[in-house]
Amino acid sequence: MAGWILRILGTMLFTMLSLLDASGTAHAVPVTGPTTGKTLPVTETAATKFSPEPAIRVGLATGQEAAVFLAKGEYVVRDGATELGLEKLSANATLTVTKRGGQFLLNGKPVSAKILVVKRADSRASIPIFYNGEAYRGDFRLIMQNGAITVINNVTLDDYVSGVIGAEMGADWPMEALRAQAVAARTFALYSLGRHEKEGFDVCPNTHCQVYGGIAAESKTVLAAVSSTRGEVMMYNDKPIYSAFHASSGGWTAGNEEAGGAPLPYLKSVRDEPTYRTEYHWQIAVSAAEIRAKLRTAGFDIGTLKRVELTPLEEGARKETADRYVSGRVRMVRFVGTLRTAEILGPKLRWLLGLPGTRFDIRYQKGTATTPNRNGKIEFHGQSSEMLLFDGWGRGHGVGMSQWGAHAMAAKKDYRAILHHYYTNVEIIKLY
């Protein structure tokens, strides 16, 4: 049995049930085919036969001295190991969890429990629990790590997805774009189960995993997008895919290897819808002195900058070179100095200089005048006013679905077509 299925089993909120009926007959599960995009009935495989919705553990905060909770109805604190009740709080009562010498304190009262669970007194109640002023669904698990408190939100997968797509996309976005984001976010969550296992949870609430905003990120349109795609995930070879997404591709998405990962058969460079928004095109000028300083902090002391080498970006050429990928993104830039030459990979340069993306060309700039990159070499002359202008398209790593591209496609395509455009040869399967 695949490892990801075992991880799902370990995070189920309810007893795991088979989709086989009492007679042992398999039900049909709707699947979108990778080429036709049509919905087809298929017999379930081991990857599709689990009906309960799994839960996911979101690590909201680590290294905390205290955590403050409040609920609009009665809620309780239990020992996470024994389920023994430790505290019962009335509606609107505040619970402050602190620590002392590796021990939890509940409103100043020490308890022996090593794991705390904060949950509604009535499990059927739909009241939110507030953590540090923000409302969340599900319940909370608190653990002590390295003498500090880690706060974990245990939530059903689709409640988690609702808190993700509302934070990743605007509530006023087209419904088909929101649905595509819901399936991508749900798939990424399943793929990422156990990503932060050493810290006691599955995923973090920021861009390292997916931005998660809890109930504050929800809206009617977001909830509708999640419910209308309930349980749907993208699969390749019977496993959830690494469904990466980004803000804007700048015309062409990137293959997974272009962002420093291993090549993946379902994450290829594809043509994207131009959006002609501020997210699409950007320019950033960096002085020669700042480039030298940034390279030196990364261990490359090139001395005074003499030349920068990069093949000019040709729109529509789709030509791979030694320093560019087929999408036009930068594989490597060569910086020639008085002391040495440094070849910096595109993703590393993006991080060093704070660039929005790696699909860019370069220009020489002095004052307000700029000179284009005609032959792949930009010469510098040791003058303090010299700048290197990065002229770029797209924001983010460029891999997988472009959110603004999905926004544009939603005017003519449904969410399945959007997903099949960005993720090659995948199946969209309803898991629960």
Model-derived segments and spans:
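Conserved, single-site charged/polar hotspot
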Residues: 2-432
